[in-house]
Amino acid sequence: MPSEFQKRKLALAFYKYDLSKDGILEAKDLELQGHKVADLLKVKQGDAEREKIVSAHKAVWDAYFKPGDTDGDNKVTLDEYAKAVEHYYSNPGNSHELALEVNKSVFDSIDLNGNGQIDSVEYAVFLRSLGVSEADAKVAFERLDTNGDGYISRDEFAKNQVDYFISDDPEAAANWFYGSY
């Protein structure tokens, strides 16, 4: 059973992605996020790069959020999201491997240049598309780049994602996964 702190972080993540601000997650929220990323990068409407960015975010819906839609209405409520997250991370022994698999599309949507690493600019664009300030995005990246090499690897990303949801430590670096908490 998640602690109150863990529930708060889970709700924060859910509402960050709820870009339509209607209390549910749908494919349109991820499509909107893709357009926000493209806007932040000044990619014009109709440009092939914009479509690639939006498609990557639609893939996040399909791989990460849609499996939590237990009633098949193409919408994910906070309760459905909480149950999906609890299922993903209920076994800490294999949660890192599962996070690598489940979060591949999320990582790929942030890794805009496709080099297999996320740099500070890419992470800032991701967080800013979710409404996080530039200053908080900078702090978040510094916290999540656990080896200090200037990049977040797939392993660092997966570990931080798992720790974000399972850690009950208010000082854990992973708490910054979605910006300040």
Describe the predicted segments one by one.
Residues 1-15:
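Plant-biased recognition of short, low-complexity, intrinsically disordered N-terminal tails
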Residues 3, 47, 173-174:
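Helix N-terminus capping/helix-initiation residues
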Residues 16-18, 22-93, 105:
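Acidic (E/D-rich), amphipathic helical modules within compact regulatory domains
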Residues 60-114, 124-181:
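EF-hand and EF-hand-like Ca2+-sensor regions
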